[in-house]
Each structure stands twice: as structure tokens, then as C-alpha cells.
Amino acid sequence: MTPTTPADFVVAIPARYASTRLPGKPLQRIGDRPMIQHVTERALLAGAREVWVATDDARIAAAIEHLPGVHVAMTGAAHLSGTDRLAECARIAGWDDQTCVVNLQGDEPFAPAAGIRAVADLLQHSGAQMATLAAPVDNAHDLFDPNVVKLVRTAGGDALYFSRAPIPWHRDSFASQRDSVPAEGQWLRHIGIYAYRAGFLQRFAAMPPGMLERIESLEQLRVMEAGYRIAVAVTPEPFPPGIDTPDDLVRAQVRVASP
């Protein structure tokens, strides 16, 4: 396979009905269809060989089981993370260990197809156990917001660390002002899309959480603390924000309604 050969991949979408800030989030309507349907359409547009929604809720399953090209994996209700849910989905789907699985969040109705393909291609050609995407931080609010995860990476593009803190910490600039992004350096925010082989997904789900994951509440740190590589590429086009709150939902509805 040459470096220009597009990756063959499947997309798995974890979808939970319960949401503290936006109950029933996957079924909230954006335009004429539920949010989860928009997400499956983005995955199909990206060229995924298979698209699966992993859920433990019959209402979500009923909303999408009729969609062409979309499969439903009814998973257990006790999963503590989306990774655990996707590991069960992979077993239900019967994917072999080498299958490239893209983990696309169920609240990303506007995820660009190019970005979905990019993370699959990155896994294919990087040799890392996982791949993910990042985007430049262009404002101080995001840089200092703990809900916006930042990352640093090696010169070769592998993740060095993910944090809710602003990393790298610009000692001189931040000592005097924190209302802008320093001109010197590169600040990246993490985009929560992942690719991994189905076999590594099972290994990941079986690992116990590490100290760093528990402190930062960032699941990907489990992989790094265990010594595995995560390749990171800057997204080829912007990822619009996901839907987390009622205000986010209103903005998404306005976006779809706009001519």
C-alpha cells in the first residue's frame, strides 16, 4: 500500500441518551432529523465501509435502525466510557483485529468528512497505536478554559501530553498577561475524534485507568501512560463545535435553517 492509498475504515459512534446538560441529546432535532442521524450521514459521506451506532437505549436504536448503511449495536448499560462501549460494539460487529475503527462522537453533527478520513489515513500511515486530530488555539479564552483540552506533540507529530491546562506554559508571556495567545510557540486544542485498530481498542478498554487519566479526567492519557503512541495531525478543515448544551443546540438549529 502506498502512502497515497486512502485507508479502509469503519466508523463507530457511541450514543447515550442520558446527558446532564442536554437530556436525550442524540434525539434532539436539528432541522428535520435527529442529531444522531446527522452524525451517521457525516460518517457515510467520509467513505466509511461500515457505520455503527453503539447505544444502550432502544429509543436511539429505533430512530436510526431504518437508515441505509447504518448498523446498531445494542451495548450494555454499565459502561463507564465511550471506549468501553465501542469495544463491545467491535465484538458485536465481528471486526478483525486489523480493522481501522474511527471513534466519532455522537454530538458532532457537522464533523467534516475530510477530517474523518484524515484521522483514518493518519493511523494507516503513522505506525502509531492511535491517531487523533488537533486545531490551532486562536484565542485566550480557549487557551485557559479547562473544558478545552490542549496538547503538545513531538517534532514527528506524536502526542507528548494532553491537558486541561494551557500547555506549553509560556513563562515570560503569561507572567505579565493572559488575555491573548502568545505569538511565539504553537498552541493546539484537541479534537475528540480517534482512530485505532480493533485489536488495540480491546486492549485499551481492558487497561486500568492510570494516575494521569484520573487527575486530568482524560481517557487518552491511559494510552500514553502505558507507553503507546498517539499520532496527531492538524485537521485539514475546521471542526465546528460539538453540541453540549441547549445553547449549542439552538446555534446548530439556526445553522441548518440558514439558507
From Swiss-Prot:
Disulfide bonds: none annotated. GO terms for biological process: CMP-keto-3-deoxy-D-manno-octulosonic acid biosynthetic process; lipopolysaccharide biosynthetic process. It comes from the Bacteria. Keywords: Cytoplasm, Lipopolysaccharide biosynthesis, Nucleotidyltransferase, Transferase. Its EC number is 2.7.7.38. Pathway: Nucleotide-sugar biosynthesis; CMP-3-deoxy-D-manno-octulosonate biosynthesis; CMP-3-deoxy-D-manno-octulosonate from 3-deoxy-D-manno-octulosonate and CTP: step 1/1; Bacterial outer membrane biogenesis; lipopolysaccharide biosynthesis. Its main location: cytoplasm. It catalyses: 3-deoxy-alpha-D-manno-oct-2-ulosonate + CTP = CMP-3-deoxy-beta-D-manno-octulosonate + diphosphate. HAMAP family: KdsB. This is 3-deoxy-manno-octulosonate cytidylyltransferase. It comes from Xanthomonas euvesicatoria pv. vesicatoria (strain 85-10).
